[in-house]
Amino acid sequence: MAATTFIAVDMGGYQLADALAQTRESWIMAMMTGYMAGATIVFTVPVALKMLEKRDRKYLALGVMSGLLAIPIGVFVASAVIAVSHPVIREVVSTNADATYQLALTWAQIGVNLVPLIIICVALALGLKFKPDAMIKGFIVFGRVMEGALKIVFVLVVVEYFTGLFTMVFGSFGFDPIIADEDDMFRALETAGAIGMMLCGAFPMVYLIRKYLAKPLAKIGGAVGLSSDATAGLLAGSANVLALLSMVKYLKARDKVICMAFAVCCAFLFGDHLSFTANFQPSLIVPVLLGKLAAGICAIVFVHLLAVKKAEELEAADLAAETA
């Protein structure tokens, strides 16, 4: 579970969890965690800190921390569906192996694996409730540390690729190659290329949504208390969080934190994560979708309870400072 709490499933967490898990059931629960926590920590937060304007980072912090609270619920829902349905999965990391292992996930296993997540989420909730300003500052510092660490790792990997320096000096190198090789045809550089290609469609999609779907989205959002812009943001984020991040600057503070909280659990729902699941574990598509959707809905509830009021106060303070 720890592996995919910090590393996204489709960025190496799936393979790492496979190597570390004692049972196939724990592996699959870790997979569910990685779809939400791992994707947020290793991808969404560092990328958002680069894409968003500085004044929007506090809304990112409030939204993400609120969304993290819903992750145990999403993992529980997905695991409960698995516990009831007993799907047959591929017991190795493969896109073409036969599904031969029938999962026998017990309620006791679910409870034990969720304990660390629940402890983290309770601590986050208490911090957001009683010390929101300190939590925002701490989150931004954490994001900068993550960004710096990723840059250092990138430099080390590039140096190793072109010179082999670390292998010569230390006898081995702890990180995977950055470019595809005979062992893996989809390394980090290929992942970056895939992200770039996704952006080619994501930004036009956001433009078309805002231009042609504003009225129907306003009606749909109004029924559940959301603005048309917030509804468009949720829809964009469900495909890819990059599409959502590109439209954050157009949103009100309230909508920003709602969309960011939802994205913690539901980003990539109908894009990357659906595709990854269909390729590696097609029998788990339904649990993944239900778990992420349940968590996304709960994230919206949590952000209303814990962060919307604070976001509106921060927005009012920003406006007052600009007009002063």
Q: Where are the regions a protein language model picked out?
A:
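Structural signature of hydrophobic alpha-helical transmembrane segments
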Residues: 26-39, 107-121
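Hydrophobic core segments of alpha-helical transmembrane domains in multi-pass membrane transport
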Residues: 68-80, 113-129, 147-162, 194-207, ...
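Inter-helical loop and helix-membrane interface segments of multi-pass membrane transporters/permeases
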Residues: 19-26, 51, 79-110, 166-183, ...
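Interfacial loop-to-helix junctions that mark the boundaries of transmembrane helices
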Residues: 100-114, 138-143, 182-191, 283-290
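C-terminal transmembrane helix pair
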Residues: 27-76, 228-324
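Intrinsically disordered, low-complexity non-transmembrane regions of multi-pass membrane transporters
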Residues: 89-104, 123, 127-141, 167-184, ...
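Transmembrane helical segments that form the transport core of multi-pass membrane transport proteins
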Residues: 1, 138-235
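Membrane helical hairpin/interfacial module
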Residues: 1-37
